Amino acid sequence: MNQERLDTKVGSLKVQVIEPLKELRIDVIDPDKDVNADLTFVGRFEPMQEPRMVMKNGPRTTMDSTRMTQHGSWNGSISFKDKEIKVSKNEYKGSRDRSWGIRPVGLPDSQLLPPLQIPQFYWLWAPANFEDSTSHLYFVDDSLGNPTHSHCVIQHEEEVDVLSDLRKEITYKKGSRRISEAKFSAKKSNGSEVSWILEPKYHIYMCGLGYMHPEWGHGHFKGENQSTYDSYDLNEDPHDPPFLHIQAICKFTLNEDNKTKEGLGVLEELLIGPHSPSGFEELLDGSK
């Protein structure tokens, strides 16, 4: 970005702000890789600002960031070689998020911090769209299963409710860290109970977006106009880096005000290291 934040074009990718915090346009024109996209995002509701997240490794601050998440619809097209996907706002609802602050991007610190410890990070992040509302919740747990960060919001046309007492019940696929079912519950500001059941259908690998990618990680400069893409067989599911981090497309069943509704969203999963409630004791051991 040449040290200019208003220059939102990087190589073949350009992001245009049509209306701040409401409408964005994403253009991708990469004739060398035969990848093109023209997508417009329009927010359904106001963005939700998540609480500030500060994480430390001993005295070192490893993360000090804030994120906003917004639900909305997508419209446009994506083409790759001889295939084209038409995206219509009536069929394609989803979310977008943006964070700012200190995050572990670029090359890692060459100075290790003794004593060396097993890395630990338990992250669940779950935005969802329903016909007349949206919801968003997330967890960060320590190794004992205590939430160090959590947040939950439900948005309606005329109402935004920040929930409290967020709880979870997680079922894993045997021998793995993949989630087969997730149940969440929380209390609205009026004291009424809300619950979700998430049923994962399929997933994508976040290394395709640069997370934990061995060569094209976030903040790695490859040249002015360099680009690449990876191809993954989603029927295969390796459980080693960089494939630990996924977003699972889920059916959401929400029970709110004694009414049940179904929606669609994602459950982002990054589960590394010990987590007592799950029975995880080592870096990458699976469910018993």
For each feature predicted by the language model, list its residue ranges.
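Structured soluble/peripheral alpha/beta segments that form catalytic or ligand/cofactor-binding pockets
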Residues: M1-K288
